[in-house]
């Protein structure tokens, strides 16, 4: 084929597309742009076919969304080259030339070359192909062949089979996206509640003969006019969002990625407020639209199913005067039942809980609830019957989480608790929450509920034991619903939430003792986590102070349960067994303190030494064998380590009190997720730096560090480190660390230059780059000793602890203890430090400035020798 100059055509097409986008920028009407882009490409393709002819008798057809008449700025152009018979060599050359020309034109075609028989065969085996062909549209070539394809596709279309296949396909797609419209970075096309769900509904309706548009589907009785209007509005919102994503990135991008969210918010003219980022406000709009689509999707799919697979109403069995069981779904007896008696809006969910044979609600009931939700007003909320019903829902032995989720989806819970409405769809770009506030709240309720189930008792034995012994444990669900209810308002959300739950308790007639408990839990829901992870639990005063704040055993048990459920509901990455151990240790120490256990330092020291001695005897060590080692240890050492650690150290060091070489011993932690590392060597200024550098290079995350210097000048340092995710063989890792870390300590200078910090996973790096944590450092003297407490907050990154350790060394600051708290990509660490530099205002200021630089990633790099 002779060379064809496509540049004039390409330039005309590009100019026309640019003009269409410019018009969209003036008047952002999604359908107008999609139609215009489709028209431009249609015209270009028809001109192209004149320059690069189709094989004789062939057809060029648009399929998929392009066939439907929609073309996004950077979408593939889906084409079918339909041949009347298998291609000859000449036909193949013609097709090849046409496809090459499509690429030269800059269209990025998604093309297939098939005969009519190929199309029928492919459609039989693949519902996606069948759907794409059902939306085919003639562009050029033989109209007769196109009509034959249309006739063949319509002839083989079985509405019932098509419905079942599309429903399964949708369920699989939803599962791929974790069955939630509330993803951090949703795909506006494919995620639940997105554009694809809207398309599936229309495909199902079209196949069943109920129309091609929302208006026609409403006319067929599957939708009300207001529902059709809501869906049309949501569809336009998602179409515009997808267009904006393409224009913002200059590529086919359907994911609302972290780094795109601020730019999108700017395009929409959304500005940050004093308490909310613009990106959070943008995403709240997205989640509200996706929730609407998800809910109406359920109603419509059920409606279509009931039309396609009708069953007589005689199958229904009355539950009571208001509800019946219709094909294992809760059905309202009278369609106007909720309007006549709004109390049924809550009782419907209670009936669902009390009848385990019900698998859901009928489409009629869902629609009636949806359209009656406005009946939940101030008068409804004041009604004692409704208040009692709401508490009954929380007190049921089953179905609590399912029904609270259903109440949220149907907008009943946000209407009943207006303060809850504010947090629906509210994302927190704080680097550790991966759910919206409302979804996190329901996840906390779910976690509390799991503690009550015998089949999950092995997951958290202490939690299961405590909740079984807690009277009226449903009060925990109340506390969970309110613990983050004031997020995004500004101010202390714990204090504001406590006021809200106090009002709820008064309105709902809670016993004063119970009301005081839930208020305490909401006000102090962060307390136990902070003490366990940031304070020295070996200090009796820390335990006494915490016990004084908690007050009694009921509060302690309830706070422990809420804390575990809260952390577990934040993100799968935030919880680990080490945090679980810290919380359990704090619980048991506080329980003993509340029970009158005398926890002064002298008693703790004596008991700990006695228990450590007993453990060393069990290991075959004589009492006199350990004395040389113990004589080098001061009181601080025995107070900072438990008996098991002291015995472990003693067994390995009693015979080498002053070794010539570094001693490194490692064992798996008792909770089985990490390693306990002991380092014993002659003290040196860069020892902590070298050790942290090694851990960082090996992707070992330090959770706890205790640094001690013996009377004769040897460093005895203890670390808890977590192995990389997915690392199964901890014993092999322990052996490797023992060998490699000892080698590093023998030659720390060479080790420091060999250090190469690990990298964060790409998605975590993107998120922390877009939503960074403002670095903070607070240095304050410790009231009970000559040490200082350094609290830091920053975005997590590889090498952060190593960078801080270098600052300590450079300023002559000695580390005594480190408590590392990592919350997703946010760190909140506490260091107990000492050093003469901290006693002088000028050098103290220089130290704090260097710490802030290190937190921000601006620390000076060390040059290789």
Curated annotation (Swiss-Prot):
Cross-referenced Pfam families: ACT (PF01842), GlnD_UR_UTase (PF08335), HD (PF01966), NTP_transf_2 (PF01909)
Uridylyltransferase: annotated span: 1-318
Region described as Disordered: 747-767
Gene3D superfamilies: 3.30.70.260, Hypothetical protein af1432 (1.10.3210.10)
InterPro entries in UniProt: ACT-like_dom_sf, ACT_dom, HD/PDEase_dom, HD_domain, NT_sf, PII_UdlTrfase/GS_AdlTrfase, Polymerase_NTP_transf_dom, UTase/UR
Cofactor(s) listed: Mg(2+)
EC number: 2.7.7.59, 3.1.4.-
The reaction(s) this protein catalyses: [protein-PII]-L-tyrosine + UTP = [protein-PII]-uridylyl-L-tyrosine + diphosphate; [protein-PII]-uridylyl-L-tyrosine + H2O = [protein-PII]-L-tyrosine + UMP + H(+)
Start-end of Basic residues biased regions: 751-767
Activity regulation (record text): Uridylyltransferase (UTase) activity is inhibited by glutamine, while glutamine activates uridylyl-removing (UR) activity.
One BP term from GO: regulation of nitrogen utilization
Domain ACT: 676-762, 789-865
Molecular function terms from GO: [protein-PII] uridylyltransferase activity; phosphoric diester hydrolase activity
Domain called HD: residue spans: 437-559
Record keywords, A-Z: Hydrolase, Magnesium, Multifunctional enzyme, Nucleotidyltransferase, Repeat, Transferase
Region (Uridylyl-removing) residue spans: 319-675
Role summary: Modifies, by uridylylation and deuridylylation, the PII regulatory proteins (GlnB and homologs), in response to the nitrogen status of the cell that GlnD senses through the glutamine level. Under low glutamine levels, catalyzes the conversion of the PII proteins and UTP to PII-UMP and PPi, while under higher glutamine levels, GlnD hydrolyzes PII-UMP to PII and UMP (deuridylylation). Thus, controls uridylylation state and activity of the PII proteins, and plays an important role in the regulation of nitrogen assimilation and metabolism.
Domain notes: Has four distinct domains: an N-terminal nucleotidyltransferase (NT) domain responsible for UTase activity, a central HD domain that encodes UR activity, and two C-terminal ACT domains that seem to have a role in glutamine sensing.
Family the UniProt entry places it in: Belongs to the GlnD family.
Protein name: Bifunctional uridylyltransferase/uridylyl-removing enzyme
Naturally occurring in which organism (per UniProt): Bordetella pertussis (strain Tohama I / ATCC BAA-589 / NCTC 13251)
Gene: glnD
């Amino acid at each position: 084929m002779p060379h064809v100059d496509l540049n004039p055509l390409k330039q005309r097409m590009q100019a026309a597309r640019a003009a269409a986008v410019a018009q969209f920028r003036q008047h952002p009407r999604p359908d107008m742009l999609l139609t215009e882009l489709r028209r431009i490409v249609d015209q270009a393709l028809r001109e192209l076919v004149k320059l690069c002819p189709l094989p004789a008798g062939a057809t060029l057809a648009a399929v998929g969304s392009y066939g439907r008449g929609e073309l996004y700025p950077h979408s593939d152009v889906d084409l079918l080259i339909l041949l009347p018979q298998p291609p000859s060599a000449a036909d193949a050359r013609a097709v090849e030339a046409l496809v090459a020309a499509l690429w030269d034109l800059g269209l990025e075609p998604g093309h297939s070359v098939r005969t009519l028989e190929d199309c029928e065969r492919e459609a039989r085996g693949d519902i996606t192909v069948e759907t794409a062909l059902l939306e085919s549209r003639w562009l050029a070539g033989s109209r007769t062949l196109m009509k034959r394809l249309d006739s063949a596709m319509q002839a083989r279309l079985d509405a019932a089979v098509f419905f079942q296949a599309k429903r399964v396909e949708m369920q699989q797609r939803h599962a791929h996206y974790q069955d939630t419209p509330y993803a951090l970075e949703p795909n506006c096309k494919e995620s639940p509640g997105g554009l694809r769900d809207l398309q599936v509904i229309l495909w199902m309706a079209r196949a069943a003969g109920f129309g091609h548009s929302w208006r026609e589907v409403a006319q067929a009785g599957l939708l009300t006019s207001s529902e059709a209007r809501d869906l049309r509005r949501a569809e336009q919102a998602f179409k515009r969002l997808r267009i904006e994503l393409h224009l913002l990135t200059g590529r086919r991008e359907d994911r609302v990625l972290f780094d795109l969210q601020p730019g999108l918010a700017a395009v929409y003219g959304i500005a940050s407020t004093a308490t909310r980022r613009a990106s959070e406000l943008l995403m709240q709009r997205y989640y509200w639209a996706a929730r609407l689509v998800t809910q109406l999707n359920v109603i419509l799919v059920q409606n279509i199913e009931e039309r396609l697979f009708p069953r007589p109403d005689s199958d229904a069995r009355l539950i009571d005067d208001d509800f019946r069981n219709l094909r294992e779904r809760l059905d309202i007896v009278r369609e106007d039942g909720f309007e006549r008696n709004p109390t049924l809006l809550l009782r419907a969910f209670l009936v669902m809980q009390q009848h385990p044979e019900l698998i859901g609600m009928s489409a009629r009931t869902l629609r009636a609830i949806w359209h009656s939700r406005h009946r939940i007003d101030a008068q409804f909320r004041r009604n004692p019957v409704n208040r009692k019903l709401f508490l009954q829902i929380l007190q049921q032995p089953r179905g609590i989480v399912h029904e609270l989720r259903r109440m949220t989806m149907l907008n009943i819970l946000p209407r009943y608790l207006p303060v809850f409405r504010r947090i629906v769809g509210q994302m927190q770009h704080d680097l550790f929450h991966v759910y919206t506030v409302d979804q996190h709240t329901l996840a906390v309720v779910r976690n509390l509920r799991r503690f009550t189930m015998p089949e999950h008792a092995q997951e958290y034995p202490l939690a299961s034991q405590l909740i079984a012994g807690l009277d009226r444990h449903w009060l925990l669900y109340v506390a969970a619903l309110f613990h983050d209810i004031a997020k995004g308002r500004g101010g202390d959300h714990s204090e504001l939430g406590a006021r809200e739950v106090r009002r709820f308790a008064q309105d709902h007639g809670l016993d004063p003792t119970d009301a005081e408990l839930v208020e305490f839990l909401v006000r102090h829901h962060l307390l136990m986590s902070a003490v366990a992870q940031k304070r020295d639990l070996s200090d009796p005063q820390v335990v006494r102070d915490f016990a004084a704040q908690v007050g009694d055993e009921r509060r302690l048990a309830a706070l422990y349960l809420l804390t575990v459920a809260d952390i577990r509901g934040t993100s799968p990455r935030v919880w680990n067994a080490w945090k679980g151990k810290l919380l359990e240790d704090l619980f048991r120490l506080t329980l003993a303190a509340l029970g009158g256990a005398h926890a002064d330092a002298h008693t703790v020291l004596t008991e700990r030494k006695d228990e450590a001695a007993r453990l060393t005897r069990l290991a075959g060590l004589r009492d006199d064998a350990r004395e040389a080692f113990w004589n080098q240890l001061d009181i601080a050492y025995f107070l900072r380590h438990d008996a098991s650690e002291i015995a472990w150290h003693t067994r390995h060091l009693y015979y080498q009190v002053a070794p010539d070489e570094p001693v490194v011993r490692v064992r798996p932690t008792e909770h089985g997720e990490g390693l306990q590392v002991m380092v014993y060597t002659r003290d040196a200024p860069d020892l902590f730096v070298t050790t942290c550098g090694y851990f960082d290079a090996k992707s070992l995350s330090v959770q706890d560090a205790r640094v001690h210097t013996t009377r004769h000048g040897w460093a005895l340092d203890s670390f808890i480190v977590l192995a990389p995710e997915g690392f199964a063989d901890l014993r092999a890792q322990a052996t490797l660390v023992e060998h490699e870390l000892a080698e590093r300590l023998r030659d720390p200078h060479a080790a420091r230059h060999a250090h190469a910090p690990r990298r964060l996973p790409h998605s975590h790096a993107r998120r922390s780059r877009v939503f960074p944590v403002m670095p903070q450092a607070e240095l304050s003297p410790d009231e009970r000793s000559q040490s200082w407490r350094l609290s830091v907050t920053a975005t997590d990154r590889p090498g952060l602890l190593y960078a801080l350790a270098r600052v300590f060394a450079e300023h002559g600051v000695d580390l005594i203890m480190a408590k590392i708290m990592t919350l997703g990509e946010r760190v909140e660490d506490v260091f107990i430090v000492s050093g003469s530099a901290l006693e002088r205002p000028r050098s103290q200021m220089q130290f704090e400035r260097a710490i802030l630089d290190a937190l921000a990633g601006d620390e000076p790099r060390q040059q290789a020798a």
